[in-house]
């Protein structure tokens, strides 16, 4: 049975948006989160989507030289918090978790979401939060892999085809209790484990992580031409 929306309102929910990265694949000079789509920056769109949920607050982990984020007309600006980001995404997330620990309970839930995913739907956000809260678990949005996957060696030679039946493409947000996620990331970093997302840290710590099926339009803006695709998706979602 699908949980009701009121279950979310009984739990304190926070969000973290790591936004300190250089985004070198997008541009050597322009930060993708500050590119404009329909008169709003990507970051404004992202924050607006997350605020479709009833958040206690959200933390933006930004570069110490970033003078843009704090001056943006973000939705629910009174709920915005800022902390110093790190060299890597995982460092930014950990800094934000440590910041949250000073104002929130370790039992509160936190959603970690990429700054450059402005198209996540409210229905997916609700489904993810409801699932984690109902089952007291960690979870991520993900979609089944559709394309045939090839393993390649020596740059261009296919060595084998990968069975995709049990493969899912991870997205964000990813959700866990603040204390659980902070412990998992600290443990992984102490043991020099490469962390690519929150789920990988939780997995290393032995925690269960479930997938909640997301949507293919929850794209991450990585390259210049992704901006136009994101614009089209945002327009289609309004219609």
Curated annotation (Swiss-Prot):
The record marks 25, 32 as: Transition state stabilizer. One of its GO terms (biological process) is isopentenyl diphosphate biosynthetic process, methylerythritol 4-phosphate pathway. Keywords: Isoprene biosynthesis, Nucleotidyltransferase, Transferase. Pfam families: IspD. CDD domains: CDP-ME_synthetase. Pathway: Isoprenoid biosynthesis; isopentenyl diphosphate biosynthesis via DXP pathway; isopentenyl diphosphate from 1-deoxy-D-xylulose 5-phosphate: step 2/6. Its EC number is 2.7.7.60. The keyword Cytoplasm does not apply. It catalyses: 2-C-methyl-D-erythritol 4-phosphate + CTP + H(+) = 4-CDP-2-C-methyl-D-erythritol + diphosphate. It comes from the Bacteria. The record marks 164, 220 as: Positions MEP for the nucleophilic attack. GO terms for molecular function: 2-C-methyl-D-erythritol 4-phosphate cytidylyltransferase activity. PANTHER family: 2-C-METHYL-D-ERYTHRITOL 4-PHOSPHATE CYTIDYLYLTRANSFERASE, CHLOROPLASTIC. Catalyzes the formation of 4-diphosphocytidyl-2-C-methyl-D-erythritol from CTP and 2-C-methyl-D-erythritol 4-phosphate (MEP). Belongs to the IspD/TarI cytidylyltransferase family. IspD subfamily. This is 2-C-methyl-D-erythritol 4-phosphate cytidylyltransferase. It comes from Acinetobacter baylyi (strain ATCC 33305 / BD413 / ADP1). The gene is ispD.
